[in-house]
Amino acid sequence: MKKNNNGKLRIIPLGGLEQIGMNITAFEYEDSIVVVDCGLSFPEDDMLGIDLVIPDVTYLKDNIDKVKGFVITHGHEDHIGALPYVLREVNVPIYATKLTIGLIDNKLKEHNLLRSTKRKVIKHGQSINLGCFRIEFIKTNHSIQDASALAIYSPAGIVIHTGDFKVDYTPVFGDAIDLQRFAEIGKKGVLALMCDSTNAERKGFTMSERTVGKTFDNIFAEHRNTRIIIATFASNVDRVQQIINSAYKYGRKVAVEGRSMVNVIGTAAELGYLQIPDKTLVDIDQIKNYPDDKVVLITTGSQGESMAALSRMAANIHKKVTIKPNDTIIFSSNPIPGNEKAVSKVINELSRKGADVIFQDAHVSGHACQEEIKLIYSLVKPKYSIPVHGEYRHLKAQAGLARDLGIPKENIFIMHSGDVMELNDESAEITGKVHTGAILVDGLGVGDVGNIVLRDRQHLAEDGIMIVVLTLEKYSNQLLAGPDTVSYTHLRAHETR
């Protein structure tokens, strides 16, 4: 791309549009680039052997001298999960709120990047200067604490990026969304609004997180004599807090299972975002020392992930927890689009084992519905609308809301990943495209697996056989030879992985 010297701001989404996940957007003005979020997405069903998917950041690598930093809206995987991979090639400072930095630090430790990466904690209401940009962090509500919207000030004008948000007047922890600040910035004149589209098809308002706490209380009261197992997102600290509150109220000990759940709860408690009464939390190995009616287990696996703790319990391969008849199992989440089949499979397996599975009324969304989106538009009064965070139908639904609120059709842009939008107060247009794409992470390999290998893995899964040959001593079972493997399939040897 040519150097931007025409007084226009460039907005370049490198992922996160027309999909759920892999959120990352570059904002460029002259010789400054600021990157908002750096998330991953999870593999599709046909991506055999793939652990996760990260965005192709070739554009950032090609313009590394301009990149001033990553600004992160909140600590969900689809907004921070790609950082350990991208930082190896684009190592610039990270700016985020306290809990978000804490969760990022966990990832950087796992990848031995903590010492080599600069991080700075920003409070809501504070601003940072990065090159030509000033970026203000605004308090919002979401299904994880410390979520932020961003007011991005540039010489071309102000852009507000909502991040993932909802309007919750009675949050479990902290303050409600700072609607007053949205209105104050709106009075200054906002060039563009980039707003969360996830629930743009849903009418009304999203319910408060506190309503789930009432549901938990009712379930605990109705199931006093059974063990309770609750699966939810590891990062939903408010949800975990309400589970702990109900467990304490009804005299139950709480155990946690799943590596990500243990890490998040540990970080949140250490930073003061989770209040755990003394002697309430016990190690998973200790639950056998308590009657079933005195135990609550919080676990990962709400999305049916094959290797998550609840899925392993359902398949009878979990080393520490065996599902018992009459266990009460609560799915405190909705399936992410694409995960419905996997979740249904786990529910069926649990039901076959005699468990009472509850998956209704135990979850509320962390994303704004139509009336909340319209409220933000009314406060901000943007000249241009750029729907973000969602599949195409979600982006289109928000575009319709923007039109209903009086924004001209020509000022509404449904962008695609890689589009280059140039805008100022006089005009806005899509002027080009940069290279984007998805990079597949397979174990320790990043970008090593392509479509040909995925196709051949599919062939192997459907039409292949592998034989393992070994020789054992008859009486002692001592290995004498091998193991050797023989495979029969259509794969070409140099493409087999």
Regions picked out by a protein language model, each given a short descriptive name:
Residues 207-331, 336-337, 344-359, 365, ...:
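Hard-cation-handling environments
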Residues 489-496:
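Conserved small/polar residues in nucleotide/adenosyl-binding loops
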Residues 2-71, 76-289, 308-322, 341-344:
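His/Asp/Glu-rich metal-coordinating catalytic cores
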